Amino acid sequence: MRRGRQASGRPFPKRGIQLIKVTAMSEEKQTKDKTAGKDHYPVLPLRDIVVFPYMIVPLFVGREKSINALEEVMRADKHILLAAQKNAGDDDPATDAIYQVGTLASVLQLLKLPDGTVKVLVEGTARARVLRYTDNANYFEAEVERIPETIGTKTEIEALARSAVSQFENYVKLNKKISPEVLGTVAQIEDYSKLADTIASHLAVKIADKQDVLETTVVSDRLEKVYTLMESEISVLQVERKIRSRVKRQMEKTQREYYLNEQMKAIQRELGEQDDSRDELNELE
């Protein structure tokens, strides 16, 4: 059995693939899914990634059960629950090894690759909780309920949102892996829930920390957690930058000393050769 691979920023390949289906979920089906309190959905366990609502992300999938789940989603034109594994190294996780809270997502595109794996483009739509897993040998399937969220007090959440955006700006300056364009996009988000989720999705933190953010249903609390995570990461990044700067200075100093030593040796060799020439002339005289 192949080990499923997960999210990557690479674009969809154009050659050597089989396009299984390109789909936009019907409006009728979307409405039904959004209004349903409880329903049964296929579950896709994820390694090393937590998908948040509003995220559009490509996933590589290789495990048989996961591929079966995606095929069922495409056949039935429904959502799928994306839930992170507690242990990314587990090739065949049990249901209790998968987090109960995940993100319902629609499948935008699915491609079958030559090596038998599948690349799928998904879009997170809502938080959801697994109530119980159903007996399905072909793929993980569970009874799922959507998780309602509360905003918090208006004054507090506005202050938290401003602080989070400002802190994210500091984080982006230190983390060169995030493009400046992302900051511009984040600064324009007016929905507080989306703001917290979008920032969290860009943070290089542990899966357990992102899962904690996903499971936080009070938006003001979620923004506060995201802010705290950024504060911690910024402290680490600042220390890393100081270390890199110190190492760079030491390397430059070592290189300068090496260059001066080599230059001195060359001068000494040159002077030695000149002394030898003088001795030879003196002997000839």
Give residue spans per PLM region:
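Short Gly/Ser/Thr- and charged-rich N-terminal loops/segments
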Residues: 2-10
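N-terminal low-complexity, acidic/polar interaction/targeting segments
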Residues: 17-285
